[in-house]
């Protein structure tokens, strides 16, 4: 009991703070009073605190950091660098660069710009020369060889007329020239110039217009001497029977066929070599579109409907063309258009009657094809519509 009481007395008699600590507490309590009262703290109280920092007590409370402020440079949560002067480039595992770090940098000279794109090389810009692509187009030149050739659209000649057309449109173009669309006579030119056309006119030089095309095979492209305009036929894959209605020449009026506007088409068949050689009718019907005219005197029959000034020129033109072969050209194309025929028939009625008399001897062989009433109505003075309607009904029956 004595020992316990003696030990407890010793602990109670010992002060809780040392005199230095007590002095420090009093100094802090005084500063606190100034702060609570709102009065500025005297500077001597602050200086005393600064001096006390150098004491052993302060050194124990705030231990000296050997790294200094390096922790703020490395950032929070990072481990301190065990080797400060070494390059910090690693592979993410155990390997680390052994070189010395560059001054004011964490990496050496080799790894300093590793993050940047060092593979930038001066690429030589090769100037590629672009050649202009020219679309080839099908052209026909006005010479003795009318075979189609491919010519560039960028270098166009004035001596060649370019057509972008198919083979069917070529045949239609040859038929249109044979039909009188070239404008050889003055009446024909006046007719087509008075009507508005939707297709452009390719121009030709006068030297080319004087040349004529002699085609021994399937095509014949003809350009007359006084021709100032030609038709550029669209490249449509239509049948040959639709070419007679092209450019509004043979319009279908009330569903009337070609015999309404071309009643003289059947008459030209009598002048053909098929009739003179007395070939069977089945042969003519099987091959009606390949008609070769060798007798130029009988070809000139359809020129009697033109004016006297133009007929002399056409007669001279056909003397040079003694043999021509037309593909997809029916015999009705040997005759001029309905409007030209109507205008010229008033002036040359005597010549028309002579032609009827000359061809009357050869009508009987084709009566089984056109009907018996056709020959009677042919000599009558009915209108063209009546004649064609009778012939159409006869052939339909």
From Swiss-Prot:
Annotated QLQ domain ranges read: 16-51
Tissue spec. comment? Strongly expressed in actively growing and developing tissues, such as roots, upper stems, and shoot tips containing the shoot apical meristem (SAM) and flower buds. Also expressed in mature flowers, but weakly expressed in mature stems and leaves.
Give the residue ranges of motif Bipartite nuclear localization signal: 78-96, 114-121
Q: Name one GO molecular function term.
A: ATP binding
Q: Which residues form the WRC domain?
A: 81-125
Source organism's superkingdom? Eukaryota
Q: Which GO terms describe its biological process?
A: DNA-templated transcription; leaf development; regulation of DNA-templated transcription; response to cold; response to gibberellin
> Any idea where this protein resides?
Nucleus
**Basic and acidic residues: bias regions:** 288-298
Q: In which family does this protein belong, per the annotation?
A: Belongs to the GRF family.
Quaternary structure and partners = Interacts with GIF1.
Q: What does this protein do?
A: Transcription activator that plays a role in the regulation of cell expansion in leaf and cotyledons tissues. Acts together with GIF1 for the development of appropriate leaf size and shape through the promotion and/or maintenance of cell proliferation activity in leaf primordia.
**UniProt domain comment:** The QLQ domain and WRC domain may be involved in protein-protein interaction and DNA-binding, respectively.
Would you tell me the protein name for this molecule?
A: Growth-regulating factor 5
Q: Which organism is it from?
A: Arabidopsis thaliana
